[in-house]
Amino acid sequence: MAKKVAAIIKLQIPAGKATPAPPVGPALGQHGVNIMGFVKQYNEVTAAQAGLIIPVEITVYEDRSFTFVTKTPPAAVLLKKALGIETASGEPNKKKVGKLDRSKVREIAELKMPDLNAASVEAAMRMVEGTARSMGIEIVEG
């Protein structure tokens, strides 16, 4: 018989740097999950992606066991990494923070495809371009 799901917890944690401190500890502790067990497993799985924020979906079962699935980093994080900037524009319509060519947008869209609700890479590219525009990043042909 299948285990009963007690809760699904969604968190965004820096890759390889999960600690029992907030937000991880309290989120898992209230469901009775072995926090150190999760932290060790998460850090092992995400060690190769250091420097990125990785969303994770933790499924907690009634017997207090858990499984987790890591997702692709948020588009905003990938765009900032591609441009090498720390923060996006506070006023995206007035102040642009950089220019990104379409080939780089395609790379990011292809990386994000498994987590995006898009039928094609072109649709995923439009989603990534929308995120870029809202961050003050100009998309140029190239």
Swiss-Prot record:
PTM comment: One or more lysine residues are methylated.
Q: Which GO terms describe its cellular component?
A: cytosolic large ribosomal subunit
Could you state a single Gene Ontology molecular function term? structural constituent of ribosome
Picking any one GO biological process from the record gives:
translation
Pfam families in alphabetical order: Ribosomal_L11, Ribosomal_L11_N
SMART domains registered for this protein in UniProt: RL11 (SM00649)
Which UniProt key words apply to this protein?
A: Methylation, Ribonucleoprotein, Ribosomal protein, RNA-binding, rRNA-binding
Q: Where are the transmembrane segments?
A: none
Reply yes or no: does the keyword Cell membrane apply.
no
According to its UniProt entry, the function of this protein is described as: Forms part of the ribosomal stalk which helps the ribosome interact with GTP-bound translation factors.
Q: Which family does it belong to?
A: Belongs to the universal ribosomal protein uL11 family.
Q: Please describe the quaternary structure of this protein.
A: Part of the ribosomal stalk of the 50S ribosomal subunit. Interacts with L10 and the large rRNA to form the base of the stalk. L10 forms an elongated spine to which L12 dimers bind in a sequential fashion forming a multimeric L10(L12)X complex.
Q: What is this protein called?
A: Large ribosomal subunit protein uL11
Q: Which organism is it from?
A: Desulforamulus reducens (strain ATCC BAA-1160 / DSM 100696 / MI-1) (Desulfotomaculum reducens)
